[in-house]
Amino acid sequence: MSAATSPSERRVSARIGAISESATLAVDAKAKALKAAGRPVIGFGAGEPDFPTPDYIVDAAVEACRNPKYHRYTPQRAPELKAAIAEKTLRDSGYEVDAGQILVTNGGKQAIYEAFAAILDPGDEVIVPAPYWTTYPESIRLAGGVPVEVVADETTGYRVSVEQLEAARTEKTKVVLFVSPSNPTGAVYSEADAEAIGRWAVEHGLWVMTDEI
């Protein structure tokens, strides 16, 4: 640590110091600043709906706030919420998940970080197909892992192959990130390709982290 480092900077952990600012939020902040200055701007940063939350959702939230049943905090979340998520997963995705296997978080970023924190040890590598959502590498670093990029371009429809993944695998590889549909490209893997990647991961004892946000 250099002598020029300020006291406030020295109080920040090495984990926090290793991550970068969100490029998405940086671009979004710049766009909003330009709009506030009267400049015409079309923002391609953070995705924010331009329509209000439907009334029935607002009404349900208000009713829940008024119901004493929901005034008590539970870190495991309400059993009926987990049951509803399990039911939706079966209905929409076609596979059955026990409610006891469901963890409710305050958003996708929390879920992704906690998942990496639960399975990564310092120095473990995570294969990350690129292009990717900017949160992934920083979540991996914050959890002590090392992101390893595998680039997929327009020639492959922005989809990585098993051969590419195998070329990136090392003794330190512990996780492969699999996102379909992809954010930001929108690429969708075929059933055959998804199965091939899954079989490859099982063969080498790797975790598969999926994000279907």
UniProtKB/Swiss-Prot annotation:
One function term, GO molecular function aspect: L-aspartate:2-oxoglutarate aminotransferase activity
InterPro entries in the cross-refs: Aminotransferase_I/II_large, AspAT/PAT-like, PyrdxlP-dep_Trfase, PyrdxlP-dep_Trfase_major, PyrdxlP-dep_Trfase_small
A GO CC term attached to the entry: cytoplasm
Subcellular location: Cytoplasm
Protein name: Probable aspartate aminotransferase
Gene: aspC
Essential cofactor(s): pyridoxal 5'-phosphate
Coiled coil: none
EC numbers on record: 2.6.1.1
A single GO BP: amino acid metabolic process
Subunit structure, interactors included: Homodimer.
UniProt similarity note: Belongs to the class-I pyridoxal-phosphate-dependent aminotransferase family.
